[in-house]
C-alpha cells in the first residue's frame, strides 16, 4: 500500500485524534492509519480528554486489542479516579499529563492516576508547565520517584520540545509537520530520517532558524 505523507517525510510513528465520533468509526480510522505505518504499535491515539467514568473503560476495552503505541488524554486531566480505572481496563500504554501544569498536579497524577512506570508515557508540556523551570521540577521529582527519563515525551506545536528532549535525555519529542503553522515542523534544512531528527548547530531554541516563526515575530514586533 502506498505510504502517506507523514511517512514520506521520514516519520515512522504517528498520532491521531479520536473520541469525537462513534468508537466503531474510530477503530476503522485506526486501522486505516496503522496501515500506513509499520504496524499499529507505531500509532498513538489522543482522546482529547473526551471520555468519562462510563465511556472511558468501555472505549479502553475496545482499544485494548489494537496494539497501539499509546492511548493519550483519556479523560478529564483531574479525574484521577477515572484515569486509574481506564489504566486498569487497558493493558497497553497510557499517556497523560499534557493538561496538567504544576508539580502539585503531577504528584497527584503519579499518586492517584494509576500510571505504571514500566509502560506509561508522561506528556507534560514544557511551555504549559509554568515554563521550563516548572517542567524541570516535574522531571526531577518524577524521576526521583522511579520514572525513567524515556517515559517523558513532551508535545509539539511550539518548536521547543526537541531541544528540551535533547538537553535532558528524554524519550522523544512530538513534531507536528503540518499543523500549528507557523510553529510546525523543524528548523530550516532539518528533517526527519527514519524517525529521528538532529538539532541545528546554532544558539537558541530553533525559532531563530525557522523561517515561518521568525517572520511572524518580525511582523508582530515590527522588526526589520
Segments the model singles out, each with a brief description of its role:
Residues 34-37, 169-172, 221:
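Structural signal for hydrophobic packing residues in well-ordered secondary-structure cores
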Amino acid at each position: 500500500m502506498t505510504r502517506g505523507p507523514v511517512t514520506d517525510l521520514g516519520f515512522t510513528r504517528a498520532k491521531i485524534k479520536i473520541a469525537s465520533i462513534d468508537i466503531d468509526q474510530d477503530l476503522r480510522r485506526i486501522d486505516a492509519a496503522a496501515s500506513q505505518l509499520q504496524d499499529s504499535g507505531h500509532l498513538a491515539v489522543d482522546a482529547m480528554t473526551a471520555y468519562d467514568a462510563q465511556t472511558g473503560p468501555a472505549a479502553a476495552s475496545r482499544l485494548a486489542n489494537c496494539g497501539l503505541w499509546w492511548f493519550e488524554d483519556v479523560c478529564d486531566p483531574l479525574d484521577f479516579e477515572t484515569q486509574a480505572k481506564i489504566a486498569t481496563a487497558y493493558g497497553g500504554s497510557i499517556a497523560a499529563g499534557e493538561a496538567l501544569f504544576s508539580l502539585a498536579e503531577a504528584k497527584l497524577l503519579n499518586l492517584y492516576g494509576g500510571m505504571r512506570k514500566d509502560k506509561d508515557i508522561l506528556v507534560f508540556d514544557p511551555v504549559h508547565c509554568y515554563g521550563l523551570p516548572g517542567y524541570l521540577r516535574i522531571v526531577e521529582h518524577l524521576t526521583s520517584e522511579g520514572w525513567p527519563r524515556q517515559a517523558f515525551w513532551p508535545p509539539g506545536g511550539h518548536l521547543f520540545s526537541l531541544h528540551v528532549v535533547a538537553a535532558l535525555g528524554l524519550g522523544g519529542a512530538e513534531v507536528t509537520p503540518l499543523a500549528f503553522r507557523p510553529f510546525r515542523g523543524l528548523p530550516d534544512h532539518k528533517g526527519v530520517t527514519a524517525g529521528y531528527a538532529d538539532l541545528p548547530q546554532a544558539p537558541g531554541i530553533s525559532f531563530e532558524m525557522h523561517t515561518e516563526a521568525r517572520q511572524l515575530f518580525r511582523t508582530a514586533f515590527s522588526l526589520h
